[in-house]
Amino acid sequence: MKFIDEALIRVEAGDGGNGCVSFRREKYIPKGGPDGGDGGDGGDVYLVADENLNTLIDYRFEKRFAAGRGENGRSAGCTGHRGNDITLRVPVGTRAIDNDTKEVLGDLTKHGAKMLVAKGGYHGLGNTRFKSSVNRAPRQKTNGTPGEKRDLQLELMLLADVGMLGLPNAGKSTFIRAVSAAKPKVADYPFTTLVPSLGVVRVDENHSFVVADIPGLIEGAAEGAGLGVRFLKHLERCRVLIHLVDIAPIDESDPAENISIIESELFQYSEALADKPRWLVFNKIDTMSDEEAHERAQAITERLGWDDDYYLISAVTGKNVQPLCRDIMDFIEANPRHEVEQTADEAEVKFKWDDYHQAQLADHQFEDEDEDWDDWSEEDEEGVETIYKP
């Protein structure tokens, strides 16, 4: 299945149903009075996270999603049916952004998380709501309000504990194949990895973490060179970044300069991402002796002014890979993910007399009615209700 991590869709909530103007007409019940019902509220549009999805391909071709309109009110005080809600399933890790205002509406980071993205319109009021001591036969009603309509930008950001960084052919995919059951493509040419991939690293029976591999970065990626930096967003939720470096590049490039290139691209993309904990891991030490590998790594770190620890591994042979994984696991357990609790403020429950409808009622000024307040006539048929429409 094709990996799609961005989609632009239009969501339209349902309009509210209109109120009804109706009077009760029944023999032997003089002056039956108003009985027009309220309309129904418009349907809402929700996003819900589904762990069984891993791409936004469902929204590549189908772009418009509309909830149901609320039914109009009816006679006999019948309220219109509420419009049907619609729920759009998206992968866990999806972020919703208003495409016009660029406002981030929220992130869906847990399976089953649900988010309202378009609110349905309010229902209109029937003429029963306008009955008073001085207006016993009201012919007023209100119409329902339009539902929200918005262009929504969906962005999928993978949820992983560890993110892999490095130039093309640094050995990132080989490392993931060595430590997990994931089998990303490995070849001897740049940009073998074209889309992000995830692997689960199981340190022992009770401990595991998720590692994300993204396409390699090159100099100028922030300006769009290579595959650009569009996949760097998948590392924003990682707790630690593993910067994998080819200690002896086949093109004889300088490893210290290669490290500086990645650091520069990170800062140009996001300072927050650049400030994440980053571990330096030198790969492909199987191509030289242990003594030469240590000498090269020490010379590179001294040139960079790197004061933290670093690792020497061979992803092909598996040398020193398990100790690295255990250290990563210890770091993850010592630094649990701090999730912002998105607790929605409990809105005050208001049934029909909410602020909108109070304002609608206040807009109508009534005059004293005459004695023939309900327009009753002996010619009216038995059991017939009169409904007035504008």
UniProtKB/Swiss-Prot annotation:
Its cofactor is Mg(2+). Coiled coil: none annotated. It is found in: Cytoplasm. GO terms for biological process: ribosome biogenesis. Its EC number is 3.6.5.-. Residues 366-384 have a biased composition (Acidic residues). It holds the Pfam family GTP1_OBG. Its main location: cytoplasm. One of its GO terms (cellular component) is cytoplasm. GO terms for molecular function: GTP binding; GTPase activity; magnesium ion binding. Mg(2+) binds at residues 173, 193. Keywords: Cytoplasm, GTP-binding, Hydrolase, Magnesium, Metal-binding, Nucleotide-binding. GTP binds at residues 166-173, 191-195, 213-216, 283-286, 314-316. Disulfide bonds: none annotated. Residues 160-333 form the OBG-type G domain. It is an enzyme of class 3 (hydrolase). Residues 363-390 are annotated as: Disordered. Residues 1-159 form the Obg domain. Belongs to the TRAFAC class OBG-HflX-like GTPase superfamily. OBG GTPase family. An essential GTPase which binds GTP, GDP and possibly (p)ppGpp with moderate affinity, with high nucleotide exchange rates and a fairly low GTP hydrolysis rate. Plays a role in control of the cell cycle, stress response, ribosome biogenesis and in those bacteria that undergo differentiation, in morphogenesis control. Monomer. This is GTPase Obg. It comes from Pasteurella multocida (strain Pm70). The gene is obg.
